[in-house]
């Protein structure tokens, strides 16, 4: 694991140990396996809304720092975590999600097997994980999620 990746894992684990008020933590986590999934998860230039667009339309704000949360009452965070390329980060993200204040995770499924939403759901249980097909070939796997 690279130093940068280990630093991110350590930061997520440390945040899970802090006892922050609910108003200072995001309610929703958005994860995707690759930055190439960002167009679908955030919203595309062609005007198709993504999870980011939907949440901001509902009044949520993106929270990029626990130390300086946005003024909005409802917030979300966005991470790129791969079940294949960064499994340690994905595991830490899912395992600490509830302790970091998340109420739900929205996970983009980029491949046929929907590994990211399925693995995130199995680790973060009982926290709900909503799988979003990023590609057409992901639809069947996401529909088949428990």
Q: Across the structure, where does each feature detected by a protein language model lie?
A:
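N-terminal small/polar loop signature for handling phosphorylated ligands or for N-terminal nucleophile
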Residues: 84-105, 119-120
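Short, ordered loop/turn segments at secondary-structure junctions
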Residues: 35, 81-83, 110-111, 133-137
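Short, acidic/small-residue loops that bind anionic groups at enzyme active sites
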Residues: 120-146
């Amino acid at each position: 694991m690279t130093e940068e990746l280990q630093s991110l894992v350590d930061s997520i684990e440390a945040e899970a140990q802090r006892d922050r008020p609910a108003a200072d933590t995001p309610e929703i986590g958005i994860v995707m396996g690759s930055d190439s999934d960002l167009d679908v998860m955030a919203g595309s230039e062609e005007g198709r809304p993504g999870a980011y667009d939907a949440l901001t339309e509902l009044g949520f704000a993106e929270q990029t720092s626990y130390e300086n949360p946005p003024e909005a009452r409802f917030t979300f965070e966005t991470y790129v975590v791969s079940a294949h390329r960064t499994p340690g980060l994905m595991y830490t993200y899912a395992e600490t999600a509830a302790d970091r204040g998340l109420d739900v995770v929205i996970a983009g499924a980029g491949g046929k097997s929907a590994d990211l939403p399925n693995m995130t759901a199995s680790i973060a249980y009982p926290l709900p994980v909503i799988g979003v097909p990023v590609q057409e070939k992901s639809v069947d796997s996401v529909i088949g999620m428990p």
